[in-house]
């Protein structure tokens, strides 16, 4: 029956006035059955797997990230939008799988989470495929070429890079830009220089920055979430320093001014975590001994929040740490990121129980996809490994150089340089970009040496943008797009080196 339906479409398109729609019939036939034509442009597959099946393998690899995008967006919308401070406290203090499952089944409900998450993610997915597909069909009809299968991957990658609160018309505009400008204008699938999904996100990021950053990471109605957080903070008596918020790790990192030093963070951590030794302990104790002359009987690890703020913001001449009073909340927030306190714990970052773009939060889900892509030979493990090495080494060098240059274990170096290098791999969209974006076979290099250099370059630029550039909290998107631009050049020099070695 399906074959008869496809044949009937072919018969209709054979008529003169419908011949321009032949690419549509060909696309339907190719989607349902094996294509009858050979690939004329890259990527070329030298086995029985055609491009459609090859693209479907990438979609399968995205299943874990897609499921967790639905799950996390659902539970976060329910908790943050509940207006219940006790529910929020219970959610933020989950410490293991047993307590997490207990929270889900006793306080929220599994089906409520899935239903809420589907209402957030599925409309964006439908818009992505519908608008992107319409653009593909339009260009195929006008140019009289076949409709390629590239949209199968682009259509699901794109919504996974968006915040859940993005307006639908903006999502449609972004995918249209990605398909038309970054792909079709270059000749279609296999000819594009830039990753179409990332290009669409970059277009939205620079055109509508207020909708792509800030308090946009929970639910589908930012106003409702904001009112709910205000209600919860008022009920729990929270201040701006320790109150509930939508801040992400990278937003906290980006908003931390250079005047917040490592010694400020270490002093706060020693109080919160009751640590007996932090890297700058000697400098802190030296200052604290002077400060306690006017505040007798106080212990560093037993200060109240007001006393801690007084110590950290008092002038150096009085035994304080010299932080501006208006920047104490920034120092308090970055302490959670550096030391993995509360919602920014390493476990939450790895498993994905954090705020962020829909598909980027879970490093675990991305690793599952990476294993599948490497085993099937779809993605290059060289690009993944070199990307991770480049990011890790760059973050580690920032820390080491800060210690060597500033002295005293980097006490007076900017605090943002001391995030553990391994935690940089869990933050933001690094894992998602490493697995699914940087390994795009069309916009990434093809030579082995070029792949190593390409990955190292992207990892290096990601950390540079995160730590140095004050305008952009996340560097993965810009780093990958910049790497795409240099990919042909890297391949060119890699080929020259290979030829010289052969000679």
Curated annotation (Swiss-Prot):
Protein name: Na(+)-translocating NADH-quinone reductase subunit B
Family: Belongs to the NqrB/RnfD family.
Keyword entries, A-Z: Cell inner membrane, Cell membrane, Flavoprotein, FMN, Ion transport, Membrane, NAD, Phosphoprotein, Sodium, Sodium transport, Translocase, Transmembrane, Transmembrane helix, Transport, Ubiquinone
Pfam family, one: NQR2_RnfD_RnfE
EC number(s) given by UniProt: 7.2.1.1
Family annotation (HAMAP family): NqrB
Repressor found in the keyword field: no
Subunit structure: Composed of six subunits; NqrA, NqrB, NqrC, NqrD, NqrE and NqrF.
Membrane topology note: Multi-pass membrane protein
EC class name: translocase
Subcellular localization: Cell inner membrane
UniProt lineage: Bacteria, Pseudomonadati, Chlamydiota, Chlamydiia, Chlamydiales
Stretches of the chain forming a coiled coil according to its record: none
Regions that span the bilayer: 55-75, 120-140, 161-181, 186-206, 361-381, 387-407, 417-437, 452-472, 475-495
GO annotation terms (biological process): respiratory electron transport chain; sodium ion transport; transmembrane transport
One annotated Gene Ontology cellular component of this protein: plasma membrane
Modification FMN phosphoryl threonine, positions: 248
UniProt organism field: Chlamydia abortus (strain DSM 27085 / S26/3)
Leader peptide range in chain numbering: none
Cofactor(s) recorded in Swiss-Prot or TrEMBL: FMN
UniProt entry tagged with the keyword Cell inner membrane: yes
